[in-house]
Amino acid sequence: MQNKNKIIQLLGIPFTALLSIIFGLLLISFPIGIYIVFETDIGDGINYDYPITHLDIFHNTDFYQSSFDVSIGDIFVILWVFYLGIFVISILGPKQHFLKSISSIISVGKYDVQLNYMFAITKWLSILVLISALINFIQESFGIITVPPLGDNNLIQFFYVSLAPLLEEFIFRILLVGIPLFALYSGRASVRYFLKCLWTPSSLNILDSKKAIFLIIFVGILFGFAHIAFSDSWSEGKFAQATAGGIILGWVYLRYGIVASLLIHWATNYFIFAYAHFISQINYVSLDVAFSNSLMLSLEFLFLASGILAIIILFLNKFYLKNL
């Protein structure tokens, strides 16, 4: 047991350093997003005053080009404040604040990710990025290229990637995972208990997790299919990545709740594009070129290193617990 703790303490030094840097980068992305939407010209001919009713998602509806006076800037600010509120919750809870939670790895060689949302977020975000990179590497070695959907306007695209995590987590986690889990495992009917279980499914008394895992995998596959199913979707190469991401997000939702899964999803969308657009604007280069910038490559390396350490520590815990 002592040897295990010493190994985890040793690995914990670079691991907690990487998680702390990732946390800082996530925090900095909030003002970057505001700067991009309100202080740059990524929209070319349009800006943050562009009416929400003119978006193509409302085409062929009565809402399209109606007199409803709300702009994408208004909705973006609402989303921004909402995500910031969830971000603050993730730092402080549910039982410990972030810095106290990660410091236990170095001090005693033990940790409990369930004590703090941000610990779980930074850890599983790193693992998700690592697995996505591995899938992409394997697919490209077989000539399978992942092509993103074509966006007519960078401002509208950034708005969509900011909105998508909230909508997709509500559909694919709360509706398709949370409610079925409650139906399968709840022993009592109560509105308060129902809402608590949707917020944190681990509140359910899940003794046999086989059905829960099957449900998470099934919904993960649906999540992957949804990313390639439409004419303006990603290319087929995205299916494996999105499926793996959906399964990880489903597992995170089961273990840690909607706060963690939502912010991980937000980070893979808003966070990545915020930095890419920022690089694009300050260097006067296209978004495609910005994604190949040394800063973006450094961010990827940071997540990969953190993901590798996270998986090593996970396996160490499982191995030693099994043999104690």
Identify the residue ranges that each predicted region occupies.
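Non-cleavable N-terminal signal-anchor transmembrane helices
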Residues: 1-61
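Alpha-helical transmembrane segments and their helix-start/interface "positive-inside/aromatic belt" motifs
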Residues: 4-26, 71-76, 109-126, 256-259
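Juxtamembrane helix-loop-helix connectors linking adjacent transmembrane helices
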Residues: 43-75, 93-208
